[in-house]
């Protein structure tokens, strides 16, 4: 089982204000834990800069232009109440998209069985025409559409276990039955979407979790909602929106998962990738704001990807 890792120094240069939870130290914590000899077999690749035209797979041109115009020449500019930009943010965003699309290329051409993209800023809150929740563009949605356009994937599944609902991914694929979107998330919690009755064209599966939910309820949601949907859909590619803020240490939510839960969930999705997708699985970093919880969870996730 070949596992590839994409990252890039530019991801550290997307600067947020002091005290902001989505900060460069998140990537530093991940880099430190993956430097351990246990991960020596990782195929480490510097993320390529993305093709800006692929942003249009998920977002209209006028919105893309507005976001680009909001990037400051110096200092920090506010995109919305939670989302800020610094001078290198555009390059970071474009490189994150480039890494995700390259990961899709890798799993379709056989260069890797699965790929983890350690990039920031995250993407799953970005709607078609709205940047929000620390997110500029929806990297997972762009990668899904890229797989369809570049590699002829007929069905792509996006599984999102970030503690916050991926309202952006749901918005983009709401009426697109060629993409399955499955989400486990705390509810009530930002952004307030993700109720069970939000089903789109029958391609949206939301499994909201009550505050203080632990391993048993999370795993039951996977077993009863997410995995049956994947088996019924039989995707050609599985993309994980891999947020690790459902970890019990995370300050932004109240779900009590451990790194073992992310190991288990990764294994379950790898089984489905083996069954339906020729092992093709791409994992994209989303949230996770306690540095220790994030590092331990990523280590468990990537370790499972490598074990097969």
Where are these regions (language model features)?
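HDAC/HDAC-like amidohydrolase catalytic core signature
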Residues: 1-308
